[in-house]
Curated annotation (Swiss-Prot):
Gene designation: rplL
A molecular-function term among this protein's GO annotations: mRNA binding
Self-association and partners: Homodimer. Part of the ribosomal stalk of the 50S ribosomal subunit. Forms a multimeric L10(L12)X complex, where L10 forms an elongated spine to which 2 to 4 L12 dimers bind in a sequential fashion. Binds GTP-bound translation factors.
GO biological process: translation
Annotated source species: Sulfurovum sp. (strain NBC37-1)
UniProt keyword Ribosomal protein present: yes
Protein name in the entry: Large ribosomal subunit protein bL12
GO cellular component labels: cytosolic large ribosomal subunit
Pfam families the record matches: Ribosomal_L12, Ribosomal_L12_N
Length: 124
C-alpha cells in the first residue's frame, strides 16, 4: 500500500521536538538544504516615503538559558506544553524558537516570564 501525504503528516505530528530536530538535520544532509526560517528585515521607510507596517506577529526565541537552567526549563514547559525531555533539549540547544506567530501582547508576556526565570530571549 502506498504511503500518502496524510500518512506522512500524521507520522510527523506524533514526533517529539527532539525527534523532529533530528529529522530536520537528516533532511538537510540528504538534500543539501537548510531549514532556516525566512526573516524579512524591517527597513526604515519604503522608497515611496510610506511608513513601514507595524509587526503584528512575533516569534519568541530563547537565546540563553541563564545560570539556573531548571527555572528556564519550567518556563519553557509552561509556555510550549512540551514534556520535560523536550523542554530540556530546547533550553540546551539555544537559540530555540519557542512560539511562532503570536500577538505582541502574548510575546511580551512570554518574554517577561522567560526573563523572570533568569533566561534571555528575543522577539522577532
Amino acid at each position: 500500500m502506498a504511503t500518502t501525504k496524510e500518512d506522512v503528516l500524521e507520522f510527523i505530528s506524533n514526533l517529539s521536538v527532539l525527534e523532529l530536530s533530528e529529522l530536520v538535520k537528516e533532511f538537510e544532509e540528504k538534500f543539501g538544504v537548510t531549514a532556516q526560517a525566512t526573516v524579512v528585515a524591517a527597513g526604515g521607510a519604503a522608497a515611496g516615503g510610506e511608513a513601514a507596517e507595524e509587526q503584528t506577529e512575533f516569534n519568541v526565541v530563547l537565546t540563553d538559558a541563564g545560570a539556573k537552567k531548571i527555572n528556564a526549563i519550567k518556563v519553557v514547559r509552561a509556555i510550549t506544553g512540551l514534556g520535560l525531555k523536550e523542554a530540556k533539549a530546547a533550553v540546551e540547544e539555544t537559540p530555540t524558537v519557542l512560539k511562532e506567530g503570536v500577538s505582541k501582547e502574548e510575546a511580551e508576556e512570554f518574554k517577561k516570564q522567560i526573563e523572570e526565570a533568569g533566561a534571555s530571549c528575543e522577539l522577532k
